[in-house]
Every structure is written in C-alpha cells, then in structure tokens.
Amino acid sequence: MAKAIPRSGSRRSGRIGSRKSTRRIPKGVIHVQASFNNTIVTVTDVRGRVVSWSSAGTCGFKGTRRGTPFAAQTAAGNAIRTVVDQGMQRAEVMIKGPGLGRDAALRAIRRSGILLTFVRDVTPMPHNGCRPPKKRRV
C-alpha cells in the first residue's frame, strides 16, 4: 500500500484577516425597482458599482406580502443602513416601475438622513412597441 504524502499547505488559503476594506462613499445613486410583486432597492456609487442592495424578499416577506408598501419601506431601510455607515451623505434616486412600494421606499430614503440631490422617474415607457399581454379574465 502506498504511503500518504503529507500536503505542504492546508486547504484554506491565507485570507485569515484580510477582509476587503470598506470604501468611503460620500455620494451615490439609489435605484428603486417597484413591481407589483416585489420591490428591489440597489445602492451604487457614482460609477455604477453596487455597494448595497436589498429586496422585500430578502427582508423575509413571502408571497403577496412582498408587493406591499411596508415591505418596500423595510427593504429601503435595510439597503440604506449599510451605506450610511460607510459615510454616504448625498444621493440621487432613480425610481422604476408601477408598484405600490414606490412612495413608501422614497419615504424611507428621506427619513434615513441622506440628502437627496434629485429624484427621477425612469420607468420605461414604450413608444408603441411590443404588443402587451392580453387582459386577465378572473
């Protein structure tokens, strides 16, 4: 029987205490995507790199409760809490979608203490593009 050869290094590589250092981000962009089923809040820096994100689903809301205004408010609060700790003071807000969580997410962002430079609605509107799906008959 062949002898087992001892390995020179352990399986884990040398990343014991080298966590990625948190950047100071004074200005950022907050993207709110509010659909009828869920609300997703993404915080990026000015170059578009994602710093933090949250959604109603990751906050623990399941099923139809994800589309509620309270779920959107909770998701916005979770996403912004981490960037306030990283030093964000000013932000632009881009809101997309027709969902119920639009206003609730914006209210939560205003309450967080971040100074909003502008709020823009970037909901995509077709210039008579694709044919929409047929109406539901319930």
From Swiss-Prot:
GO terms for cellular component: chloroplast; ribonucleoprotein complex; ribosome. SUPFAM superfamilies: Translational machinery components. Its main location: plastid. Residues 1-24 are annotated as: Disordered. Residues 9-24 have a biased composition (Basic residues). GO terms for molecular function: rRNA binding; structural constituent of ribosome. It is found in: Plastid, Chloroplast. One of its GO terms (biological process) is translation. Belongs to the universal ribosomal protein uS11 family. Part of the 30S ribosomal subunit. This is Small ribosomal subunit protein uS11c.
